[in-house]
């Protein structure tokens, strides 16, 4: 486990505003995590050259989301963002890194509910095969 994930924690109003300019969804969270990975640190599968940096960063993101929920915090995984704008907004912090997600973090509003796209599930038969 090479741990290629890199987390940029955005807390200032200025930094949060810069991140907002890179994404189509905004959640007014007091903290935004920029989850990236360093390709130079990522494990490469020998058999086909697959770089696992994105996978490792996604696993770390899932663990952060679970830990946040245990602490009573809400998170929203944002994959719809412009990585080039994000790199331009944070050139020093993201130099050489590949951003994979923004993670909005904070206490959810009392009336907050996930959209139906986040609760509807395909039938298990469409996703799992047995042999």
Question: Residue ranges of each PLM-predicted region?
Answer:
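C-terminal helix-cap and adjacent tail motif
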Residues: 101-131
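Glycine/small-residue-rich phosphate/adenosyl-binding loop
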Residues: 1-57
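Short secondary-structure junction motifs
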Residues: 2-5, 73, 100
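Short, electropositive alpha-helical surface patch
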Residues: 85-100
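Short secondary-structure boundary segments
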Residues: 37, 80, 107
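Solvent-exposed alpha-helices and their adjacent loops that cap or buttress functional pockets
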Residues: 1-2, 25-27, 92-96, 119-121
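A short, acidic/glycine-rich surface segment
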Residues: 17-20, 42-43, 86-88, 110-114
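Small-aliphatic-rich amphipathic alpha-helix that forms the alpha element of a beta-alpha
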Residues: 33, 41, 48-89
